[in-house]
Design a protein with these regions (language model features):
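Beta-rich accessory regions
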Residues: 21, 31-45, 49-53, 59-229
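Hydrophobic core segments of beta-strands in well-ordered, beta-rich domains
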Residues: 1-6, 10-18, 67-76
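Beta-propeller blade termini and top-face loops
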Residues: 26-28
Length: 229
């Protein structure tokens, strides 16, 4: 349901919603004479069930420059009557030269910024949590650049209470996914990396429903730093 079909780069993208797994897309080629769409790649915006806390029902439009702007409906982590819910921030989809869909925040989100905090270059020792005391709040925009080097995994806990009763975990696993050549012949001898979002400890409220971890593939080029935004 909620189908949208738009050109993206030199190809086409078909966005839709599954009532079991949430928002998804097909990337492919469109024959205007035959009026046929030939998909070559399937991707997801949601990697588990859309309930609770998943994204669904996309609304999309062209940005007029070869990209696509999409906004999703989203269920909260609480039971709510009827069709009540929230919407995500807009996302801009673009197609890179390797036929990979790039996703980035879009719109005037800069107007939401208030108290800027900057953290200088910091060494991250293995198997130790580094707590940044001066970063607080329940609504944060994070722009972080991390040199993964040989680390197989890095974890960032956000929205963390002082005693760690509540926290949301973001984990990045370098080169721990499947071979990239399976989905793109141009990317030989490389593997997908993986990023997970875990909200099992995000709230201690009794009426908040926990969600299974999201686990999504991410392409990180050799020697490229990880940029989280």
């Amino acid at each position: 349901s909620c189908p949208y079909f738009w050109p993206i780069g030199n190809r086409y993208i078909f966005l839709f919603f599954s009532h079991t797994t949430g928002s998804q897309y097909l990337l492919g080629d469109y024959n205007k004479e035959e009026h046929c769409f030939y998909p070559t790649f399937h991707g997801r915006f949601n990697f588990m069930s859309f309930l609770p806390g998943g994204v669904h029902a996309p609304s999309a439009t062209s940005d007029g420059e070869g990209g696509v702007i999409v906004i999703h409906n989203m269920h909260t982590g609480k039971k709510s009557p009827g069709w009540r819910g929230i919407t995500t921030l807009p996302r801009k989809l673009t197609l890179d030269k390797c036929d990979t869909i790039n996703i980035q925040p879009y719109g005037d989100y800069k107007s939401l910024r208030t108290h800027h905090q900057h953290i200088d270059k910091t060494h991250l020792p293995a198997n130790k949590e580094i707590i940044i005391d001066n970063i607080q709040g329940n609504a944060l925009e994070i722009k972080a650049e991390i040199n993964i080097k040989s680390s197989p995994m890095i974890e960032m806990n956000v929205l963390r209470s002082p005693d760690k009763e509540e926290f949301t975990s973001i984990k990045f696993f370098k080169d721990r996914g499947v071979d990239l050549v399976r989905t793109n012949p141009a990317l030989k001898n490389q593997r997908w990396s993986l990023i997970s979002l875990e909200t099992a400890h995000s709230s201690i409220l009794p009426d908040v429903i926990s969600r299974a971890p999201e686990l999504a593939p991410v392409y990180l080029k050799p020697n490229e730093t990880l940029k989280l935004h």
